[in-house]
Amino acid sequence: MTNDYIVKALAFGGQIRAYSALTTESVQEAQTRHYTWPTASAALGRTMTATLMMGAMLKGNQKLTVTVDGQGPIGKVIADADAKGNVRGYVTNPQTHFPLNDHGKLDVSRAVGTNGSLTVVKDVGLKDYFSGSSPLVSGELGDDFTYYFAKSEQVPSSVGLGVLVNPDNSIKASGGFLIQVMPGAEDETINKLEDAINHMTPVSKLIDQGLTPEELLFEILGEENVQILENVPAHFECNCGHDKFLNAIKGLGEAEIQNMINEDHGAEAECHFCRNKYQFSEEELQQLLDNIK
């Protein structure tokens, strides 16, 4: 069982749609699997948290993938999630770390870079995909997701993300919020929201203080204004498997498979998302080859 979960809520009589998430254990699982250093952990954790909350907007078997590519030293940050609270992610260069920035925080912007884009691909079923992209504005990721919603999905939003890392590289706290203004929202509501967000304590500090996702929303929106709709358990989950990789090997073609048999006497594949390794024997590859022929 995981302690991580996502909260879905409405506020101010439906003028505001809100999500918040506690992701400490999910991000710890990613940190353990990928051996990420603190700055990389923060970048990956923030991206996973945002992706998880975006996944909570989906239905049924729909899923989405987020790719952040700012041309920075960390390379790409990739996460995907579904409507059921499953999330996974990885970074190209997990051993990326820098001294704290001028604000005494992990320098995520320096690791991610700002010369690039945030891309979202939603798999909405029936081989139907929605793709949206926006330029990175700060590389800190919260601002970048906020800008993505405004630019690509035309929904005024505020995204706050935070990850705190312990001296031993383990994850101390991780979570975030995603608040969206619905069509027809009153100016007074929008002004209240902007004022609250501008004056709030950083997300990672609030989570570190023990605030639950519900309390995080109460802090921003006022408890009396919030209607909690649903809680969804969240966890790091990878859907890779032996058969999936065997299928991928099949796609390489006969010559490449024959090469694996002759030269390597088998094959090994590693999943980018969870680093599980899969072994394929000569016999298995030969059988695959026979089936293709």
Swiss-Prot record:
Matching SUPFAM superfamilies: Hsp33 domain, HSP33 redox switch-like
A Pfam family matched in the record: HSP33
Location within or outside the cell: Cytoplasm
Keyword ATP-binding applies: no
Disulfide bonds listed in the record: C238-C240, C271-C274
GO MF annotation list: protein folding chaperone; unfolded protein binding
GO CC terms in record: cytoplasm
A single BP term in Gene Ontology: protein refolding
Keywords attached to this entry: Chaperone, Cytoplasm, Disulfide bond, Redox-active center, Zinc
Claim: Transport is one of the keywords in the record: no
The record's account of how the chain is modified after translation: Under oxidizing conditions two disulfide bonds are formed involving the reactive cysteines. Under reducing conditions zinc is bound to the reactive cysteines and the protein is inactive.
Primary location class: cytoplasm
Cross-referenced HAMAP family: HslO
Function statement: Redox regulated molecular chaperone. Protects both thermally unfolding and oxidatively damaged proteins from irreversible aggregation. Plays an important role in the bacterial defense system toward oxidative stress.
Family listed: Belongs to the HSP33 family.
Name this polypeptide is given: 33 kDa chaperonin
